[in-house]
């Protein structure tokens, strides 16, 4: 679907990092932003995982903020909803989590840590064309992509799933991929 993006540590701050030639250090996060194609249709899924198998306390805190934002967006997905509403939901959920961590006091500053939109179309292209000003319709497929980037902590991460709009909500097509701190740490401990 596209060249895989694999980045460790602060290289995650380069959203489409294309030079995976650096050594990854103990304690760093590794971003895996990958896709697959079938009959010319593509996917786009991202996860981060700790190089040493365990999230640090700060990494886990930020990961949970992004996870909660990702899930808040999924709860809003249904026919008739507009993409800008989902982007707003992601920013609002991220703000609440970042505020609780003492990183933000004013919603106007959210772009300091949330650098990209929360949704984009997938299909014939990774960032497929589609009307962002048109409401969602049943059987549309797009990403839910919550990302948080805190340079002063040296932590950047995103959780990106592919979802299918259903009559009453959405189906997470990438639900089988571990996505919570606990699921990822468990997987890392067994491999």
Question: What are the roles of these predicted feature ranges?
Answer:
Residues 1-191:
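Active-site neighborhoods and metal-handling regions in enzymes and metal-associated proteins
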């Amino acid at each position: 679907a596209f060249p895989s993006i694999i980045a460790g540590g602060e290289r995650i701050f380069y959203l489409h990092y294309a030079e995976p030639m650096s050594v990854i250090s103990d304690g760093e996060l590794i971003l895996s932003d990958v896709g697959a194609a079938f009959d010319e249709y593509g996917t786009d899924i991202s996860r981060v995982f700790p190089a040493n198998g365990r999230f640090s306390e700060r990494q886990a805190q930020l990961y949970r903020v992004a996870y909660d934002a990702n899930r808040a967006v999924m709860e809003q997905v249904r026919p008739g909803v507009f993409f800008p509403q989902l982007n707003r939901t992601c920013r609002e959920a991220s703000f609440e989590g970042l505020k609780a961590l003492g990183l933000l006091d004013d919603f106007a500053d959210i772009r300091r840590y949330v650098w990209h939109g929360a949704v984009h179309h997938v299909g014939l292209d990774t960032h497929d064309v589609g009307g962002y000003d048109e409401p969602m319709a049943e059987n549309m497929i797009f990403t839910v992509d919550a990302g948080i980037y805190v340079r002063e902590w040296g932590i950047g991460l995103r959780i990106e799933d592919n979802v299918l709009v259903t009559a009453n909500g959405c189906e997470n097509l990438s639900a089988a991929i571990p996505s919570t701190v606990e699921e990822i740490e468990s997987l890392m401990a067994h491999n």
